[in-house]
Swiss-Prot record:
It is found in: Cell projection, Cilium, Flagellum; Cytoplasm, Cytoskeleton, Flagellum axoneme; Cytoplasm, Cytoskeleton, Flagellum basal body. Keywords: Cell projection, Cilium, Cilium biogenesis/degradation, Coiled coil, Cytoplasm, Cytoskeleton, Flagellum. Residues 119-301, 347-366 are annotated as: Disordered. It comes from the Eukaryota. This is Intraflagellar transport protein 54. Residues 199-220 have a biased composition (Low complexity). Transmembrane segments: none annotated. PANTHER family: TRAF3-INTERACTING PROTEIN 1. Belongs to the TRAF3IP1 family. Pfam families: MIP-T3 (PF10243). GO terms for cellular component: 9+2 motile cilium; axoneme; ciliary basal body; ciliary pocket collar; ciliary tip; intraciliary transport particle B. One of its GO terms (biological process) is intraciliary anterograde transport.
Length: 465
């Protein structure tokens, strides 16, 4: 199978062998022509046709890189001036031994320019006697020109199709790789943004919950004794926090639980309700009981004044002016009364003092001294709470605004991502259009080149005739 490079080498050999015989035109040398080989070809062509100019080729060898560049620039300029077509080749590529197809095209154009120069130099001489015969033979020349154009057009179309096929495959591969890379980057960026958004939402919810929910103080646990059970057995009582409650008295029944090794001694109850039992065996007892029942309803109560101050509201004063029991009560009632009197004596330290049920002015003074700072503290705390409520509302509003701004930012980022993808697609389409224009321009250059070649062939055939 003949490749494009092999075909170019053969066409180069065909174009140069009509002009020169040395240096040898071999496929090995033309597969990657060195600079010395190109210099020898230019010198041989110049000696045979006078093109390029002998002054520009008057070198045995050129070793300096700048001089080589100047020599190639001069040769390319002369070819362009002679043919009127620019030579599509890079001098650096020729010196480096790269881009061999363009180097071979330059050599072919060198041969064509030399042939054209030779024809023009011969046409400047007096025309030969057979000139009328040439004018008569013009129709066959037109046919040859048409055949040459057709052949060049077919060759050009074939090369153009091959080039377009290669470019199309390369563009498809690059486009596919770019789309996959963009898709992967977009997915990774969206996952990262979604994860970050979820974390921020969770943090905001936690902050809002912590700001809204008040800090509750742990309940205090106390114990109270039960009259119906033993002293050692206690039941836990949960004391709820409340405000505007007067401080407890010194002899309050409630006490905090302390870790002690021995159980505390039982304290006497502050108040006992004793129901009088009627005895039918004694008429005197029945009469006394009936008399007492008419006075106080059949019940005798021993009251603790401090307990009354703590438990009873201030609107219900306790009246302790009940008449003392007479000495003619029964034995059971007498024992109960003696027990109550002994309890009062043990509690107040003096038997002559009777419980009044109301706190004295002396007992209220320490309570007032403690209650006033507590009330001030409560009022200060209430004022601080009232002042902090607007700030809490503003903080909630700020949280809502921040959440809205984050949502808008997320929407804007999505819009920017879409715009970026659209711009990338437009850029790829512009690149494709640019490649198509370049391919068309290249095909036009090839057409011009084929037309020039056909013109040279026609001139050569004219000279042969």
């Amino acid at each position: 199978m003949i490749t494009i490079e092999t075909e170019l080498i053969n066409s180069t050999i065909d174009a140069l062998k009509e002009l020169i015989s040395r240096p040898p035109l071999t496929e090995k040398l033309l597969s990657r022509p060195p600079f010395k080989y190109i210099l020898d070809i230019c010198k041989a062509v110049s000696a045979a046709t006078g093109f390029p100019s002998p002054e520009s080729c008057n070198y045995d060898d050129i070793t300096d890189r700048e001089e080589r560049t100047a020599f190639l620039t001069s040769i390319i300029g002369q070819i362009t001036d002679q043919l009127g077509v620019p030579v599509d080749v890079q001098i650096k590529s020729i010196l480096a031994g790269k881009d061999v197809p363009k180097t071979l095209r330059m050599l072919v154009m060198l041969a064509q320019a030399a042939k054209l120069f030779k024809v023009r130099s011969n046409s400047s001489q007096p025309p030969p006697q057979q000139a009328p015969r040439e004018t008569v033979a013009s129709p066959p020349q037109e046919d040859l020109e048409a055949l040459a154009r057709e052949k060049a057009e077919k060759e050009r179309q074939r090369r153009e199709q091959e080039q377009q096929e290669r470019e199309r495959k390369e563009r498809e591969r690059q486009e596919k790789e770019r789309e996959e890379r963009e898709k992967h980057e977009l997915e990774s960026r969206e996952r990262a943004e979604a994860e970050q958004w979820k974390q921020k939402q969770q943090q905001q919810q936690q902050q809002q919950q912590s700001a809204i929910s008040p800090q509750k103080s742990p309940p205090k646990v106390r114990f109270a004794d039960d009259d119906k059970t033993r002293v050692e057995e206690h039941q836990p009582v949960i004391e709820r926090p409340h405000f505007n409650r007067p401080p407890p008295s010194q002899h309050s029944r409630r006490m905090a639980v302390t870790a002690t090794s021995e159980p505390s001694a039982p304290q006497p109850s502050a108040m006992r309700l004793v129901k009088v039992v009627r005895e039918e065996s004694s008429d005197e007892s029945n009469q006394d009981l009936n008399q007492n029942a008419g006075q106080d309803g059949g019940f005798t109560m021993g009251l603790d004044a401090e307990w009354c101050d703590e438990m009873l509201p201030g609107e219900f004063p306790l009246d302790t002016g009940a008449p003392a029991p007479s000495s003619t009560h029964g034995e059971l009632v007498a024992n109960i009364l003696d027990t109550a009197e002994a309890y009062n004596v043990a509690l107040h330290g003096d038997g002559s003092k009777k419980p009044t049920g109301l706190s004295t002015q002396r007992d209220k003074k320490p309570i007032d001294s403690y209650s006033q700072p507590v009330q001030k503290l409560i009022s200060h705390i209430s004022a601080i709470i009232r002042k902090s409520v607007p700030y809490a509302k503003h903080t909630a509003f700020l949280d809502e605004h921040i959440l809205t701004m984050r949502t808008e930012l997320h929407t804007a980022s999505e819009a920017v991502t879409k715009l970026l993808s659209t711009s990338l697609k437009q850029e790829s389409s512009l690149k494709q259009a640019n490649n198509a224009c370049e391919s068309k321009l290249h095909s036009l250059k090839e057409q011009i080149y084929s037309l020039r070649q056909a013109q040279l062939e026609l001139l050569h055939s004219t000279l042969a005739l």
